Amino acid sequence: MYRRNKKGDLEIAKQLRIELPKWESQYEKLYTDSEDCLKRLSRNYEIGIIANQPLGTSERLENLGVRKYIDLVIASAEEGVSKPDRRIFEIALERSGCKPENAVMIGDRIDNDIVPAKQLGMKTIWIKQGFGSLWTVMEESEKADIEVNNLSDILNYL
């Protein structure tokens, strides 16, 4: 839907008067390498999450055992704006005190993560894992600075 409308999932659902299904957090689980990767990255970097997620994102990260590695959590339901809207990225940058050129957006979605981050001048890493493996880069504006196959591959670049 992004490539046609350039609107976030929440905005499209609202316009279509679609009630999004309740998020079943008990089915959430981390990729095998997630906790170790976050732990290692948090030693040298401040880590923030920008997510199109319902209320309670921070608590769910706590339940998964990784919140302690994350400095900032920006969830669309709490901010009233969702990716790919650049405002959610600007909120994260402002709260972190980070300039776009000093930030790296790591994401699995070209439309919601890579494109808006590049437009703001952030560096980008596309993880082609899970949902990310379903995407194909179609335009130069969608090309990430770095492409990796899984989260732990990021450690080779940062």
Describe the function of each predicted region.
Residues 1-32:
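Metal-dependent phosphoesterase signature
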